[in-house]
Structures are given as C-alpha cells and as structure tokens.
Amino acid sequence: MKFIIKLFPEITIKSQSVRLRFIKILTGNIRNVLKNYDETLAVVRHWDHIEVRAKDENQRPAIRDALTRIPGIHHILEVEDVPFTSLHDIFEKTLPLWREALEGKTFCVRVKRRGKHEFTSIEVERYVGGGLNQHIETARVKLTDPDVTVNLEIENDRLLLVKGRYEGIGGFPIGTQEDVLSLISGGFDSGVSSYMLMRRGCRVHYCFFNLGGAAHEIGVRQVAHYLWNRFGSSHRVRFVAINFEPVVGEILEKVDDGQMGVVLKRMMVRAASKVAERYGVQALVTGEALGQVSSQTLTNLRLIDNVSDTLILRPLISHDKEHIIDLAREIGTEDFARTMPEYCGVISKSPTVKAVKAKIEAEEEHFDFSILDKVVEEASNIDIRDIAQQTEAAVVEVETVTGFGANDAILDIRSIDEQEDKPLKVEGVEVVSLPFYKLSTKFGDLDQSKTWLLWCERGVMSRLQALYLREQGFSNVKVYRP
C-alpha cells in the first residue's frame, strides 16, 4: 500500500532551508507515530510531498486514520502504484478502479505529472476521460463542479491511481516550534487550547492543579493522555500534577472574598511558571476567553499576567463558548469535559471584575508563600506514556482477566462511534455497551449481582475507569484484556 502525504500550504511558502527542516521533522514524526503499525513501513521525503509505503494490508485503515491526525499534513492520497506503457494502458488501469464509482455520475479527470513523457497532462485527461465516458454508459463528463473527480498522478514510468483522499488537520509539525506548558483542567477550554498549540507545531506538556482528589486527577489524566495519544504521540511529554488544596485552604482563610478568584489564578501562574522554568518550557497555555468568567476581564487578566515573566498564550481569547464546545466535539474531548467533576473550592460570592493591583498585593501579603513553594516542590512529574502503566499499578486490586465466568458480563466502554465502527462480539457472554463518559451516572443502574468486565481497545481507559468505580465503592469490576 502507498500513501502520498501533501504538506500544509504554509509550509510550502517558507524559505528553502526552513521548508526542508519542517519536512524533515514531519517525516520523523510520521515514523514515530506509525512505527508500531508495520515493521516494514518506509517513509520517504520529497520536496513537495512525503511517501508512506507499507506491506501489511491489515493495517491500512489504522495507518490512514493515524496520518489524518498528525499536525503538518494537509491531506493524504491513498494510491495504487502501478507501471504503465502507454496512454491506453493508463486508461485500462483506471477503468476497473473507477467504473462503479462513476455509474450515474458526472465526472472529470485531473492529472498531475512528474518526469519526461511524450504526452502532456491535458492529453492524459482527455484520453482517459473520453475512454471512461465511452465505456460507462450512465456516466457523463462535466468539467466544472462534477459529482466525482478522477485524480491521477504520473511519476516517470509509474501511474499512481488515487483511490481516496483524506483531509489532515493541517498546521505545523510538532517540534518546529518550542515547547509549551498547558494548564489543563479537563474542561472544554483547556483541552481545545492544548490541541490548538499542538496543531501549531508545539510540543505540549500538561500541568494540572488538583483541587478535588484522586477522582479529578484520574479524569484529567484521561483527557491529557487522549490528546497526546491522538494528536501528539510523536513526542514524549510530561504530565505534572500539583496538589493545590493547601493553597486553596490558605486563600479561603487569609484572602478577602472578592479577591479570591484573581489571587488563585495568580498563584496558579506563579506555580506553573516555576514548573516551566524547571523544564525549560517557553510559554504557558490557558483556555481563558475574554469575559467568560469574572477573572477573565482585561483588567484581571493583566493582573494575572503581571506575576510572571513567562509568556502566557490564550488561543481561545476571542472564541465563544459554543464555538469552543464545537471544537471539543470535533477533536473528541467533549464527552470528557461534560462528565468532568467540577471543584469550586474558591468561588467568591461577589468576585471583582476589575481588580485593583494594590488591593490584590495587599491581600497576598497575608498569604504564606512557603505553602506555594512546598506544593510545587512536591509536584508529581510523569512521562505521559507511563500513565497507562501507573494506572495499571494503581488498580492492582482490580483483577485483569483474559476469560470470563458464568456470572460475568463484558462492559464495552468505548465511545458510541467506536462501538458502531467495530462492534464487540464475544461468544458465550453478554456484552453491554455503556460509554465511559456515562459510567459515573449509569453504572449503578446495571445488574449489580453480576461481575462487570470493563473493556476498551487499548486497555488504558478500562483501567482508569476501574479505579474510578472502585473509589465510588463498586467492588464488582474487573478489567478484561483477552
């Protein structure tokens, strides 16, 4: 099988040296993402495209899907690479591939050619188009706005029959820009802002301020791991968790009610800046949008920024909430965000929307900053690739099984789309579908006399959810890994 990777247009307008560097980085990213799919896979870079070749046909859908989620790729052409001897030979190889798709449709032929030939691209379009029109009675040529466009590429003595075109996510390859640290909460905003910086070529590390115990951290780890695994797995990244409950307690005790929200955000920026400096990260990323809540007015944002020299990026600053939710749905984080626990440890009854610097600094004089230093020093830092292993260790009391007993039932916790694409069928046992994002509210409605074997494709989500259900008091759960 062969795929032709077309570059994001902004890459092609760079200077020669920058363009070559971007293409080289993108080629490396593709290799890193695809290396586990096929050992024979080859990635070859060219000036205007990248080729991916593999032999394992069973991996075709997985490779194609993975390519559509790598930043820097505009679109992917799935092609059949065959030799040809003449114009008529090109037509004969095109006809069987496109006959069914063109029946009853209008069409045109578009050709791109590289190398020296006795014919022009237009001559190929006319010859092949005329032949298809003659041999498919219900098809009709239409050069403008046709139902189907037959795309052919000719490279020297090889014909690339384009079997399908798939859109990528665009942007710049990860690694072409410097690292950033995303302040992730698991909600709509922070997930989308993290994705936007990945798409712009940054390696995104994650910093989580835990205000709500283990269950909250498990949920946020799921979001971070999902984003990394889906869009950024070409690079190693960190997940830093800071226990912020002592800081919240100090704020509640020492800070005036109206100033609490801004002071909390300033403490978070201070802590995140220390983490960023420790790991050589150039900027922080937040999901703040102008005017969305009281701490996100221009006055308050300026005061929050003032506590650190570290650059703070806010990619969603002008976005509406509805648009942010649409983006979350598009990238697959909406379901996580909708079910994420909300912890409102610091909510002022009358929060200020126009904080005064002198008042904020006066309130912060009451704060014991050794508490902030201590929680930053004690912050946990893990490689995001180890989240699965750490979760496995954390749920050691939850048995992992390869088979099932008479009183067992399998619980498929994948998303609805995944279940529809690949339905789980196991003989001899009941299989029940309950997406992971409904477990917190719906698991208790299931037959609790049964033992439920949680299953997902990679096993990460099932282990995370097993730990969550254990914490909620359910002992009748196991992890199913056949």
Curated annotation (Swiss-Prot):
Residues forming the catalytic site: C456
Entry's Gene Ontology cellular component terms: cytosol
Q: Which residues form the THUMP domain?
A: 61-165
Disulphide bonds annotated for this chain are: C344-C456
Is Membrane set as a keyword in this record? no
> Mind listing the GO molecular function terms for this protein?
ATP binding; CCA tRNA nucleotidyltransferase activity; tRNA binding; tRNA-uracil-4 sulfurtransferase activity
The biological pathway it contributes to is: Cofactor biosynthesis; thiamine diphosphate biosynthesis
Q: Which domain of life is it from?
A: Bacteria
Annotated GO biological processes are: thiamine biosynthetic process; thiamine diphosphate biosynthetic process; thiazole biosynthetic process; tRNA 4-thiouridine biosynthesis
Identify the EC number(s). Answer: 2.8.1.4
Q: Where does ATP bind?
A: L183, I184, K265, G287, Q296
The residues covered by the Rhodanese domain are 404-482
Class of this enzyme: transferase
Q: What is its main location?
A: cytoplasm
- Could you tell me which InterPro entries the record lists for this protein? Rhodanese-like_dom, Rhodanese-like_dom_sf, Rossmann-like_a/b/a_fold, ThiI_AANH, ThiI_fer, ThiI_N, THII_Thiazole_biosynth_dom, THUMP_dom
Catalysis performed (reactions): [ThiI sulfur-carrier protein]-S-sulfanyl-L-cysteine + a uridine in tRNA + 2 reduced [2Fe-2S]-[ferredoxin] + ATP + H(+) = [ThiI sulfur-carrier protein]-L-cysteine + a 4-thiouridine in tRNA + 2 oxidized [2Fe-2S]-[ferredoxin] + AMP + diphosphate; [ThiS sulfur-carrier protein]-C-terminal Gly-Gly-AMP + S-sulfanyl-L-cysteinyl-[cysteine desulfurase] + AH2 = [ThiS sulfur-carrier protein]-C-terminal-Gly-aminoethanethioate + L-cysteinyl-[cysteine desulfurase] + A + AMP + 2 H(+)
Keyword annotations: ATP-binding, Cytoplasm, Disulfide bond, Nucleotide-binding, Redox-active center, RNA-binding, Thiamine biosynthesis, Transferase, tRNA-binding
- Write down the Gene3D superfamilies for this protein, in alphabetical order: 3.30.2130.30, HUPs, Rhodanese-like domain
Localization (cell): Cytoplasm
Q: What does this protein do?
A: Catalyzes the ATP-dependent transfer of a sulfur to tRNA to produce 4-thiouridine in position 8 of tRNAs, which functions as a near-UV photosensor. Also catalyzes the transfer of sulfur to the sulfur carrier protein ThiS, forming ThiS-thiocarboxylate. This is a step in the synthesis of thiazole, in the thiamine biosynthesis pathway. The sulfur is donated as persulfide by IscS.
Regarding protein family, the annotation reads: Belongs to the ThiI family.
Q: What name goes with this protein? A: tRNA sulfurtransferase
User: Gene encoding this polypeptide?
Assistant: thiI
